[in-house]
């Protein structure tokens, strides 16, 4: 059972540590996002890219990455979803990075948190599918192209969609838990010097898991809004 500094707050304890950590990540994400927005300036300064390494430059780089990914996965409609998916990516990344602080555990290693993210994605892509195609046309996505196989395909598709929030949540929670466990073990054994490579690996894992979650969510949206021809 990993220690979390938030457990010292009265009423939090181990059971609600992930909720407290999620709250910290939310405040941090909003604060850093506001600082990055303020650094844009006004007029031409807001349009020109950052000329040096800065918080603004980091946000521009990651937003450009999200934009390119949306264009590649979703297509011409991808630009409409950039604000949403950029927010998802940054928020999950902030939650993951909190686990790199000694004495903190990321909210994303708790299945309750990651399943909540998965349910959000499930509701979002289905809503976009119905909005783009209409209820009847969207339901046809579940039936496949062969009429006599439609009942079987409908059941299979429904099950696969129901499983998606669990698969998204399990993947993120298990990987983050494993990474944090490895880092914690080496910090306990040799607290100086040796854990540095594991911190580097942890940073990579934090980024990759936020990227994978965002990528899979984009794929689900792309399939949901696709028009059958």
From Swiss-Prot:
Name of the protein in its database record: ATP synthase subunit a
Keyword terms, alphabetized: ATP synthesis, Cell inner membrane, Cell membrane, CF(0), Hydrogen ion transport, Ion transport, Membrane, Transmembrane, Transmembrane helix, Transport
Family annotation (InterPro entries): ATP_syn_F0_a_bact/chloroplast, ATP_synth_F0_asu, F0_ATP_A_sf
GO BP, one annotated term: proton motive force-driven plasma membrane ATP synthesis
Upper classification of the organism: Bacteria, Pseudomonadati, Bdellovibrionota, Bdellovibrionia, Bdellovibrionales
Cell location: Cell inner membrane
Quaternary data: F-type ATPases have 2 components, CF(1) - the catalytic core - and CF(0) - the membrane proton channel. CF(1) has five subunits: alpha(3), beta(3), gamma(1), delta(1), epsilon(1). CF(0) has three main subunits: a(1), b(2) and c(9-12). The alpha and beta chains form an alternating ring which encloses part of the gamma chain. CF(1) is attached to CF(0) by a central stalk formed by the gamma and epsilon chains, while a peripheral stalk is formed by the delta and b chains.
Purpose: Key component of the proton channel; it plays a direct role in the translocation of protons across the membrane.
